Amino acid sequence: MKDPKVINGGVAIDARGSVTFVNDFDFSGVKRFYQVQNHRRGFIRAWHGHKKEAKYVYVPSGSALVGAIPMPEYVYMDEIGGDVEIIPGDKRPEKFVLSSKSPKVLYIPENYANGFMTLEENTIVQFFSTSTLEESLGDDMRFDFDKWNIWKEDFR
């Protein structure tokens, strides 16, 4: 897969309780996972990307706004005297709202940067990675949280 993709899930409820599931999610290729919980609503963790690592994102509690964008390519231009950033296809970040009330897994492909903002208190975001920690640390790029500023409130 070359673009972000949402894998939908569901909730089954009966007299015994509920079961939350994403049955079409395949763990093949996942090497590790980690879980993030911010200390407050509206906290932003962004932007972070990898050339070789893909991720799957799941929110088991609360909700989060997740952004994904192709990684910039850098070209050194001697006549300008610095690096020039080129975004493939001049893309804007794609935005996804993940919520425990509507279970789904978001696939973020390799060569993408991602970030998220918690929309509720006590939100938990789980990341499933296709790289080991050692592989990930050698393939890590970070960008300022407001580089692709998608974090504004959307009052409709």
Which sequence ranges carry the predicted segments?
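Non-catalytic, conserved peripheral segments adjacent to functional cores
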Residues: 1-101, 121-156
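Conserved metal-binding segment of the jelly-roll/cupin
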Residues: 98-121
